[in-house]
Amino acid sequence: MKRFIKIFATFFIAACCLGSCDVLDIQNENGLSTGMFWKTQDDINSGLNAVYAMFYRQGTWTRNIYTQLNGMADDGVSYAGWTELNEWTKFKYTNYNFAEGQVKMWREHWTAINRANQVLDHIDDSAISFDSEDTRLDMKAQALWLRAFYYYYMVTMWDNVPLILKTSSASDKPSNLEGQPEEQAKVVFTQLETDLLWAIEHLPLKREKDKARPTKGSAYGLLAKIYMQHKNWQEAQKCFEWIIEGEGKSIYSLESKWENNFNCKTENNCESLYEIQFSLCNYVGFDQTDNYLDANAQVGTQIEVNQSPKGLGWNNVESNRWIVDYFKREKTVDGKNDPRLFYTCWYAQAEADFPEHPDQLIYGKKWADYKYSATDNQRVFIKKYSTDV
């Protein structure tokens, strides 16, 4: 009996000790969470930079969006050996889950919008200390501009997209927008107009550094494009008047050499409202790996290799032949071909059309050096996307 009492007492004491223990809550400092993040101005800026980082994805401005916007326009065409891509630009949709024409752009535009929403959900938190109120307002305006930028292209590509202004959560339910694409586009554009008008009030007129961040002119330019999509011509005109005749006149003007707008060496010039900054030090920019992201590709681009002439790259999208013919319909006052054609396109007859430019090289070679077939000699490649002129 005594032995039983001793054993029972031992278990009772152990149970009491275990029951009174406090749970030790250890945070993993090597992994970020919402509980640890969004506490400082640096956190907000890091979140903002994550939105900018979405420029450098295949589905956005590193590669595929050019195929979509140019290839599906009247002046673009694809003769790519990749059948799905070729047919996509001709509105032949045999695979709605085609990664290059649909999935990557949809996914990565939404990722950018969700990241912007995260910044906007936290930036008004009074517990976060900023260098100044102007700093906070500028950062908020940047987030609104970025969200509007991505939404603009979402609507112009898909028309019928849901308007999501908060960070996504697991409890979110799909939006039912079937049968009302035009009305939904108006809803989205109206919200973007409101956001950009607010951003205009708080973005700086110009930036002495950080040229990759938007200014008032960037916001006015994007707002004008949205107004035009919305067929609000008078409001669009007001935006352009601010740029050309108003306060923006001190920043923006026409280039003395208009061809500078077609040259990668004269970027961010006086005609530029906003430019995405790419690095030629890592110009391939192949971000889609088995692990999804390649940290070494975050400032590069696949623009040139995607649209370069046959034999140099993938030539996934190029110009329609009628562009050349249309340019040549009207001569300059001295009887020459329109010089804009020379800076826009590269084609077999360019040397004859522009004898004032006898050594027309692209990536170190003349057209004849590529020894194209008779059929390929009728093709027209987009010269302005190269980094060789």
Where are these regions (language model features)?
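Bacterial N-terminal signal peptides that target proteins for export
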Residues: M1-A9
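C-terminal motif of bacterial Sec signal peptides marking the signal peptidase cleavage site
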Residues: L18-S20
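An aromatic- and glycine-enriched ligand-binding surface/loop that stacks and positions planar moieties
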Residues: D22-E84, V161, L197-W198, R213-A368
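Active-site beta-strand/loop architecture of penicillin-binding DD-peptidases
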Residues: D42, L361-V389
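Conserved, well-structured interaction surfaces
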Residues: N45-G59, G81-W158, G179-V187, L196-E208, ...
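Alpha-solenoid helical repeat scaffolds
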Residues: Y153, M157-N160, I164-K166, H202, ...
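Short coil/linker segments at helix-helix boundaries
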Residues: N160-E182
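Acidic donor-binding segment of Leloir-type glycosyltransferases
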Residues: E193
